[in-house]
């Protein structure tokens, strides 16, 4: 996949992460776009603080770029405690996790990103730590090996994943709070873009913010990335102010259309439409035809196309919808067995 894909929801570098951190909301009051999640977390956090207890272990899942890491930081800040961050792939050995757990203070939040990628060995250590606040570790090797238990202070594990279905049942069942993040509305994204412009001192008109939001695929990270590219365009091709016209010209230059589709999306849809007669086509066949990794298509490209109704998953594979044909101004070919042809 093109490494320069501007509308990917995956963070593409440390510089972008630093820029996103500068505009990250610091409280639930500023965490817009997920009203149900915000309401529930406010109740759970207030209740835990009222009882002077650590918040229940929390699992946050949803597509990339929707604010899982941001919510973890907000939880720690609202609870008035420190946050320690790590990720599933980093915790290769039981000792890696033990080193982190033994350095936690009472009430601390341990944030584990990509928690579905924890190794089975590390998961086994995590179970008693989550359930009983105890760490079971082995000392020595062979016949002289012995198990000792270390008491841990009450803490909150916040796990984030884009693939909740890959979590093992024992791990998933140990989370007392489970929150799913949804794609954002255009109005919510417009507010996020305007807020970022206020923080970064970028002059922007309401219509310009709305145009960026409309093409951001319901994802704040993409909205912020598009905003930076539109700002570049406005400074070079205009007077620095982001108007609706400037935003449209900049995004057209980036080949991001009015529905947020880019070249990769259009190539996938075009392949199904013209090489596979609209589908259905198996994922592996589609990946081979596009010279892409099937996992990348399934995890990165497809979710938005499915959510927007451009493709559907069937038992026989992927197929484009009538909405996709209409978007490209094409007539769906009549197939054998069709009773209706709209």
Curated annotation (Swiss-Prot):
Region of interest called Head domain (RuvB-H), as start-end residue ranges on this chain: 258-342
Residues binding ATP, per UniProt: 23-24, 65, 68-70, 131-133, 174, 184, 221
Any GO molecular function: ATP binding
CDD domains reported in the protein's UniProt record: AAA
Region listing for Large ATPase domain (RuvB-L), in residue ranges: 1-184
Keyword terms, alphabetized: ATP-binding, Cytoplasm, DNA damage, DNA recombination, DNA repair, DNA-binding, Hydrolase, Nucleotide-binding
Highest rank taxon of the organism: Bacteria
Span list, region Small ATPAse domain (RuvB-S): 185-255
Any one Gene Ontology cellular component term annotated for this protein: Holliday junction resolvase complex
Gene Ontology terms describing biological process: DNA recombination; DNA repair
Domain free text: Has 3 domains, the large (RuvB-L) and small ATPase (RuvB-S) domains and the C-terminal head (RuvB-H) domain. The head domain binds DNA, while the ATPase domains jointly bind ATP, ADP or are empty depending on the state of the subunit in the translocation cycle. During a single DNA translocation step the structure of each domain remains the same, but their relative positions change.
Protein's UniProt name: Holliday junction branch migration complex subunit RuvB
């Amino acid at each position: 996949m093109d490494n320069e894909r501007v509308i990917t929801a995956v963070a593409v570098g440390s510089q972008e992460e630093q820029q996103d951190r500068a505009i990250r909301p610091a409280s639930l009051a500023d965490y817009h776009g997920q009203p149900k999640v915000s309401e529930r977390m406010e109740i759970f956090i207030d209740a835990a603080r009222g009882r002077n207890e650590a918040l229940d272990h929390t699992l946050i899942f949803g597509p990339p770029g929707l604010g899982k890491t941001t919510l973890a930081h907000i939880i720690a800040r609202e609870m008035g405690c420190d946050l320690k961050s790590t990720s599933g792939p980093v915790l290769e050995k039981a000792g890696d996790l033990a080193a982190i757990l033994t350095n936690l203070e009472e009430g601390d939040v341990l944030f584990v990103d990509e928690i579905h990628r924890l190794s089975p060995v590390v998961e086994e250590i995590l179970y008693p730590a989550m359930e009983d606040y105890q760490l079971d570790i082995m000392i020595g090797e062979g016949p002289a090996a012995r198990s000792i238990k270390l008491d841990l202070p009450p803490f909150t594990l916040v796990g984030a994943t884009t693939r909740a279905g890959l979590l093992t049942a024992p791990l998933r069942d140990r989370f007392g709070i489970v929150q799913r993040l949804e794609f954002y509305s255009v109005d919510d994204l417009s507010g996020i873009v305007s807020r970022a412009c206020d923080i970064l001192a970028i002059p922007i008109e309401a219509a310009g913010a709305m145009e960026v939001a409309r093409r951001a695929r319901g994802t704040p990270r993409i909205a912020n990335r598009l905003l930076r590219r539109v700002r570049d365009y406005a400074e070079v091709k205009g007077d620095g102010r982001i108007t609706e016209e400037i935003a449209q010209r900049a995004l057209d230059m980036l080949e991001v259309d009015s529905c947020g589709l880019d070249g990769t999306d259009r190539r996938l849809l075009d392949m199904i439409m013209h090489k596979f007669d609209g589908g259905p086509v198996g994922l592996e066949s589609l990946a081979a035809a596009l010279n892409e990794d099937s996992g990348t298509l399934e995890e990165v490209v497809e979710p938005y196309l499915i959510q927007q109704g451009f493709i559907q998953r069937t038992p026989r594979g992927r197929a484009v919808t009538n909405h996709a044909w209409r978007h490209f101004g094409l007539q769906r070919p009549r197939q054998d067995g069709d009773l209706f042809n709209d």
